[in-house]
Amino acid sequence: MSDLFKNQNKDEYPYFVTHLECSEKGNDYDANEVHNLSAAGKPLLVRYDLSALKSSITKEAVAERPADLWRYRELLPVRSTENIVSLGETVTPLVSIPSPDGKEILVKDEGRLPTGSFKARGLCMAVSKAKELGVKVMAMPTNGNAGAALAAYCSRAGIESYVFCPEDTPEVNMREIAVQGAHLWRVNGLIDDCGKIVGDGKKVTGWFDVSTLKEPYRIEGKKTM
């Protein structure tokens, strides 16, 4: 077992999510229910009781925790540790690279995440929250990296996944998604065509549409970057 899994923080922490909020209208939605977009067709944002949170934790306490994505638990939407779906999301470094003008350039090396890209952050969070809310099937359109992350985390969680890729998706990405256990289709069209299939399929099958900004939780994982 890797050190990432040995050192993963298994403690429970206070939960500060208060509600979901429509990004356009500002009206509230119950964070304990499954939601995609608001009634206005806009993204839902997770809201926290920041006043209570400030009195509960310190930067120093967070810094002493294991160096992984979940060290920021109080600012994340998963209530219970048992619902965390993890593949070992380590903290990633800023790497200095040469610059023609002599100025410092820092690159965030997200390739160290479990599925090789920053997409692992968002899908780690979305799948964990989906597990907590009792979601059984998830689906998305993708050009590659997000689909691989969804497939990997759904396999870890025991959630069925469906992934739709446009015709020009590289074969290496297709194989990565397939080997992670997703139901995979190459669509004769563009990413928008894949998105339409997922949206139409949601109406028929009831699967959870985890397309970008069509659910509240992927962005919650990405903010840890």
Locations of regions flagged by a protein language model:
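PLP-dependent amino-acid enzyme catalytic core
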Residues: 2-225
